[in-house]
């Protein structure tokens, strides 16, 4: 019995020591966050509150633009601009070749700067860990087609962007914070030989790590870790001087992936 008591005491002492080490490491990590990510992150209480708010039917959305009139601006969306230059023209257009069957969302930008982002975001919906997909059709001159999706949008100077450059056959993940753009990842893509392409992004989390996964034409492309921005709007973007067509924009919350409590100390 005495030997067993000594062993139990040693076992508990080891666990207490390990817990202390993890607490110290966590504290040091919180003090050494890079300046580029020095934004106040969510507490676990805030994470849980946001999770409960995300589990709402209203966040399961699909926009086909088929119920709107042609040659009008899309209803329920706001336009934002990042970078100098004129605003983009976002317009619903009738097209029998649209994936949804009737209408599509056309955008034309005359902004010549390659760092010129023109956004359109869905009003009234806030996603923290979104799963967003959209169909995209690039112009015949693919050299002029650069665009994609945005999420975590707080305003015109705070958002994440996943951008496809069909001519260069690349996909970029970028972050804009306080108007400063940072590329988080870039990878090549293999577009299918079809007019319409599919872009999908998922923002997910594992314990304390937030990461972004991207897919193009049904294939995984690249992932990036970042947690600078939290909950925000979702939408579409066009970059530089070009035109694009969008259809079948889907957005749902990945709330089932969220942890409800702090990670265990072992």
Predicted regions located by residue number:
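N-terminal secretory signal peptides that target proteins for export/translocation
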Residues: 1-12
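Extracellular carbohydrate-recognition regions
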Residues: 40-83, 257-266
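Ligand-recognition surfaces built from glycine- and aromatic
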Residues: 41-50, 228-266
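Short tryptophan-centered beta-strand motifs in secreted/extracellular beta-sheet-rich domains
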Residues: 65, 132-134, 195-206, 212-214
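Extracellular glycan-recognition surfaces and repeat-rich motifs
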Residues: 69-106, 116
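Secretory/extracellular carbohydrate-interaction modules
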Residues: 108-172
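Short, aromatic/His-centered strand-loop micro-motif at the edge of beta-sheets
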Residues: 177-198
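Short, solvent-exposed beta-strand-to-loop segments that form ligand-recognition rims
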Residues: 213-235
């Amino acid at each position: 019995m005495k030997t067993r008591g000594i062993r139990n005491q040693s076992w508990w002492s080891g666990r207490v020591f390990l817990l202390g080490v993890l607490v110290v490491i966590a504290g040091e990590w919180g003090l050494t966050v890079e300046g580029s990510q020095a934004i106040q992150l969510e507490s676990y209480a805030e994470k849980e509150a946001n999770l409960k708010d995300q589990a709402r039917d209203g966040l399961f959305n699909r926009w086909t633009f088929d119920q709107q009139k042609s040659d009008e601006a899309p209803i329920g969306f706001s336009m934002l601009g990042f970078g100098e230059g004129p605003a983009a023209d976002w317009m619903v257009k009738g097209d029998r070749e649209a994936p949804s069957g009737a209408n599509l969302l056309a955008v034309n930008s005359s902004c010549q700067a390659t760092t010129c982002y023109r956004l359109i975001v869905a009003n009234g919906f806030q996603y923290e860990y979104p799963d967003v997909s959209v169909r995209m059709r690039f112009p015949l001159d693919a050299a002029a087609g650069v665009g994609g999706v945005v999420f975590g949008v707080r305003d015109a100077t705070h958002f994440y962007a996943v951008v496809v450059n069909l001519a260069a056959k690349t996909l970029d993940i970028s972050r804009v914070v306080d108007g400063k753009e940072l590329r988080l990842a870039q990878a090549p893509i293999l577009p299918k030989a079809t007019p319409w392409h599919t872009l999908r992004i998922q923002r997910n989390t594992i314990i304390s790590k937030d990461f972004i996964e991207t897919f193009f034409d049904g294939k995984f492309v690249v992932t990036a870790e970042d947690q600078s921005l939290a909950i925000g709007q979702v939408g579409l973007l066009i970059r530089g001087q070009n035109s694009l067509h969008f259809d079948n924009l889907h957005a749902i919350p990945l709330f089932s992936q969220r942890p409800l409590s702090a990670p265990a100390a072992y």
